[in-house]
Amino acid sequence: MSEPHKTDVLLVGAGIMSATLSALLRLVEPNWSMTLVERLDGAAAESSDPWNNAGTGHSALCELNYTPARPDGSIDITKAVSVNEQFQVSRQFWTYAVENGVLPDVRSFLNPIPHVSFVTGADNVQYLRRRYDALVTNPLFATMEYIDDSDEFARRLPLMAEKRDFSNPVGLNWTQDGTDVDFGSLSRQLLGFGAKHGMTTLFGHEVVNLTQGSDGTWTVKIANRRTGQKRTINAKFVFVGAGGGALPLLQKAGIKEAKGFGGFPVGGQWLRTGNQDLTARHQAKVYGLPPLGAPPMSVPHLDTRVINEKSWLLFGPFAGWSPKFLKQGKVTDLPFSVRPDNLVSMLGVGLTEMGLLKYLIGQLLLSESARVENLRDFAPSARDSDWELDIAGQRVQVIRKAKGKGGVLEFGTTVLAAADGSIAGLLGASPGASTAVPAMFDVMKRCFSDRYPSWEPKLKEMVPSLGTALSDEPKLFEEVWAHGTAVLKLDKPASSIPATTADESTAGTEHSPAAATV
């Protein structure tokens, strides 16, 4: 075996998290050596692929699970404000990156699409009105509209209005300033910036082991997945941004911070169409209420997507199940992740999360026609022949130890970092990609605590609101929002997005990384 390749920073996984961290570190430490290892042959081919996620600029504008009703009927907006604040940090960094040549093609990853909450039934419409009243006084949500008029509904959402019985009340919370994000294109542009500035990229290579030496550095053994050839990398800092593959690698590293954590994989499926008549009549990301007792991941939504400059509609998600932690993972991922330190946590979840298990079983039993019937709650005129099933990505929900329960399932993202700051990783899913920038700021602050103060002036140049809650600073919010809107071209509609043609859509097929390039 050849001499170890030495690097200051090793990034494992070529998705949005590693891509974001690589760009941030390159901007504050231009002389550091960096190496990226990715097991697949292309960047952003797992959860960051646009076909593997909803592409919502996840800012809590339309996701109703972030605004629960309290027992007295009032609306708790705490989580919605927190998620939106995080998205604002990402949006400001993207603005800086576009201005400074880090992201050369803004329209390929970001498009203006309204974000809409949708409910039916008198009680739900009343809830939506209370939600609007609670949110609209916050500067971050000030442009939200409340709509319960059927004519206005039909004007804005003609596809959803067709054949709808408006004797059943309808309600919308409409925010014009939403976005559709292609996190695959965004990841590739960020990684391209890193590669242009000296980052070594090793695609088709997999981490097989990692151990920490007495000097605090990490010896990481990797293998070429095509040839089997092995090589060694010596890294001062390791970031594991491997999506569902992060937990097994952090377990291999043996850091105590990962002990007790488990993962529960949940697959996803979408109905999709590229029918030009349908895409022309639905230009919004519309989120509804989850079925009673269903987990947050089950929130149904009918989305406009812009992928490779083509317009699509997606509806879902429908849950699938596989023991794989990655879409292109191994069936042994789940069983091999069970360790003595997390066995109690994982068994505890199996006993306490009966609602999730019931939901998954119900989803797995759905027929094709039953899925389209669910779609008709949103688009009553939907025809089976217009829609096809597409397999989305795997998400691994975090299982954490909990006193008295064994373990609890968490719906969110968790940064794990070793006490010495030499290794960190990201676990979990939603809100995920949209909060990549604040998540990576957290990694930088925790793992480079000695350097972070010297980075802050540069980071504040990238994100003017850093350390400030924009909801408490309406003037600053107006300034950064207006500037970002102009730089990111969000004041210009995604004009003349061509619809897909029949031969560009193949029913029942998964999109390979090469084909979808994300």
UniProtKB/Swiss-Prot annotation:
<dbReference type="Pfam" id="PF06039">
    <property type="entry name" value="Mqo"/>
</dbReference>
<keyword id="KW-0274">FAD</keyword>
<feature type="region of interest" description="Disordered">
    <location>
        <begin position="497"/>
        <end position="518"/>
    </location>
</feature>
<dbReference type="InterPro" id="IPR036188">
    <property type="entry name" value="FAD/NAD-bd_sf"/>
</dbReference>
<comment type="pathway">
    <text>Carbohydrate metabolism; tricarboxylic acid cycle; oxaloacetate from (S)-malate (quinone route): step 1/1.</text>
</comment>
<feature type="compositionally biased region" description="Polar residues">
    <location>
        <begin position="497"/>
        <end position="509"/>
    </location>
</feature>
<dbReference type="GO" id="GO:0008924">
    <property type="term" value="F:L-malate dehydrogenase (quinone) activity"/>
</dbReference>
<keyword id="KW-0816">Tricarboxylic acid cycle</keyword>
<dbReference type="GO" id="GO:0006099">
    <property type="term" value="P:tricarboxylic acid cycle"/>
</dbReference>
<keyword id="KW-0560">Oxidoreductase</keyword>
<protein>
    <recommendedName>
        <fullName>Probable malate:quinone oxidoreductase</fullName>
        <ecNumber>1.1.5.4</ecNumber>
    </recommendedName>
</protein>
<comment type="similarity">
    <text>Belongs to the MQO family.</text>
</comment>
<dbReference type="GO" id="GO:0047545">
    <property type="term" value="F:2-hydroxyglutarate dehydrogenase activity"/>
</dbReference>
<dbReference type="InterPro" id="IPR006231">
    <property type="entry name" value="MQO"/>
</dbReference>
<keyword id="KW-0285">Flavoprotein</keyword>
